[in-house]
């Protein structure tokens, strides 16, 4: 008798229970949770019907408030109400305090220089604050779905570095939540639209959220999502629009010295004005002062657009650079996907349409599209859609490499390489008898270590004491799907190895990625020249050291005239080795090589005689 297998529409009729997994958009301003139910992907509302949760946490003597409750108290208690905590993730306290923006919070530094918020509940770090935002989302999901979650896909900005990504994972770990994967926010949006519209070709993901801007250029082809290039700004978003409006109203009302409570109140009003101007040509802003008096001012759409025009123009410039990195033109982009609440601003949509030459896609709520894409990916990763052929390829934003002799950078994984990825290269020892090797892992596009960003250092010990160049050390760079880097060095003959997982103590500064890319292009010709010089200087040092060792061991094979001739040519190389003329050094090395050919032949003959001494012809 055949057994019927019954399943919800759109779900697999597998004999096992449907596994529960969610996608979480852990946003700077708002956060959402979504899931696939009965084949339909949607964000999950709370008991009041609210889908988004303000990413705000307030600490009081009585406990911890999260979301709308905390938001209502933010103006009255700004010191203990933490907003936009995502901007603090993976950054040092020094970096935060040296920025242009001031914060009402009281900070202390942790042992490794990271920020700690001083609250009535004690010292808390950004990871713990993020966990408090995740907590109600997880509880909401388990209550709505009716069971314990098997895992979650959490989205992060494409520009998050290793420390920021690890911090996001740690926040989920504090709640006992298994992170199936960290997913770049623009890529999550591509999943949401790619599965719905079944498009093939080049697509731009324009993601302007509360705190970050990301632009990603993707190629969609037969279910494969390949990120061709990414760009953006990790400190530009709708929050900056709010701050510009706030500054404008301060100037209009001639308010020069206001406390943090009134400042927060005005910031909330600025956000309301921004949202109102999305649909109206003007709106009235108001502010109630401590003495009860009320300030009022009409703000027009034209005024608002004048304030934010430079920032919007900055996002378009990022689009232009990223298209160039991807090797495509704006005309080749089939569709532009709008992500993030700030893309509702009319000027943003107008500028994006003007640049790409077509109206952007907005059929999926730009506030929810990232969470929806994450939920689709979570449903696949947890095993509910084993038949799915979806393949996702992200890229790394900056090249990864290792320092070699002379302060040079040997790139192991190039910028915009798809991840996950593993790359390996072989290196060797520089000196005879060398038993250890120090490794310096760097990030960047320049040719010299001094111009790149240092990520980590580690040492491989236990290398057999062989002649210089005889040992073979294989160095493997592995970047997982979450963008975290592991580097392993192994000596091939013995198998001895050492490794390190790169978790920087703090992330890149706001504009460092853009600056590094611009500098690499600006100094490209100069860098190549410096690299060629350094390579010749290193080669000169290697040749001189090797020849000195050979002369110490087998110098008696030479006549006095031969030795004097070699010493003279060696002295000439020593004299030019420290110069800044690569061609002169190279020529001196070639001359020395010519004058030592006979010596090399004598050493070879002598080695053969020694090896065969006392051996019979028959035995040989």
Swiss-Prot record:
GO terms for cellular component: cytosol. This is Chaperone protein HscA homolog. GO terms for biological process: chaperone cofactor-dependent protein refolding; iron-sulfur cluster assembly; protein refolding. Pfam families: HSP70 (PF00012). Keywords: ATP-binding, Chaperone, Nucleotide-binding. GO terms for molecular function: ATP binding; ATP hydrolysis activity; ATP-dependent protein folding chaperone; heat shock protein binding; protein folding chaperone; unfolded protein binding. The gene is hscA. PANTHER family: HEAT SHOCK PROTEIN 70KDA. NCBIfam families: HscA, PRK05183.1. It comes from the Bacteria. The keyword Transcription regulation does not apply. Chaperone involved in the maturation of iron-sulfur cluster-containing proteins. Has a low intrinsic ATPase activity which is markedly stimulated by HscB. Gene3D superfamilies: 1.20.1270.10, 3.30.420.40, Actin, Chain A, domain 4 (3.90.640.10), Substrate Binding Domain Of DNAk, Chain A, domain 1 (2.60.34.10). InterPro entries: ATPase_NBD, Heat_shock_70_CS, HSP70_C_sf, HSP70_peptide-bd_sf, Hsp_70_fam, ISC_FeS_clus_asmbl_HscA. Belongs to the heat shock protein 70 family.
